[in-house]
Structure formats: structure tokens, C-alpha cells
Amino acid sequence: VIRIEKREGSEDRFVAPITETQDGALFMQMNRNKRGMTLNPMAPEGQEIVRKLVATADVVVANLPPQTLQSMNLDYDSLRAVKPDIILTTVSAYGRGGPYSDRVGFDGIGQVMCGSVYMTGEEAGPPYRAQVAWVDFGTALHCAFGTMMALEARRQTGKGQIVEGALL
């Protein structure tokens, strides 16, 4: 697994608690045993590096709005031109269609929009967000299952595909 971050690094590096290596503990947990690199996928040299990585990859996982992927030439059609049997797993807040498709989101927004915070907290008090990022983890789990099914389908057919996941 190779994690690609923006040039200045991902925000999750700095979420407390901070370890002795000055990285966030959650970042260290979620990225254990991954290789990592930073690049600018909007720049031609960054796009060339991504294309070289895609040519040797089985799966690309992208956590960006669909329009952002397209603007960086990382949409499914662009990746398939590099490697015809590639599997692209996309995770966005609201999916490819609909009025919110270009918006970003995270677990807290997903909890509010699905109504789960309405069912928490004290009866006379404000709602509470769950302390566990269950929307993020649930979305990741469904995307992982979908990706495994796509890998099996490719083994049987030789064809790649896109797997779409959304918080809602």
C-alpha cells in the first residue's frame, strides 16, 4: 500500500495525541506498514508519477469528491487508459450524483445528516455525536468488501471496475 498525501502532509498527522515522532497516534495506527509519499497531483510531474504507480497497481483508493478526481485526471476513465483492468475505489461524502456531490464531508456530518445524533444525548438536552467514528468506519468497511468483490470479478473476467462508497 502506498499512501499519497498533498505536499504539506495530511491533517491527520497532527491529530492528538502526538507521539514522540511528532505524528498523531491515529495517523500512526491507520498507516502502519504503508509506504508513503507526497506530491502535487495537479502538476504534470505529479500526474506522471501517479500514472507510473497506477500502471503497477491492482487497486487505487481515492478519498476525494468526484469532480476533484476528474480535474486531476484520476477518474476511472483516465486510470483505465493507463491500466485497463484497474479497480478504482472512490470514497466521497455524497457520491457522484445529486446536489451535494461536489461537497466534502466527514464522520460528524454523516452522523448529523443520517439522523443518528437526534437519537442520542439527554432527553431535555442537545444531541451528541457518537464518540466512535462509526460512519467513517462503516463506509470504509463497505468499500473494502466492494473492493474485494471487484478483485474477484476481475479474476473471473479480466475486467476492472469502479467501486463507489459514500458516507450517505
For each feature predicted by the language model, list its residue ranges.
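N-terminal helix-loop segment corresponding to the beta1-alpha1 unit
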Residues: 1-162
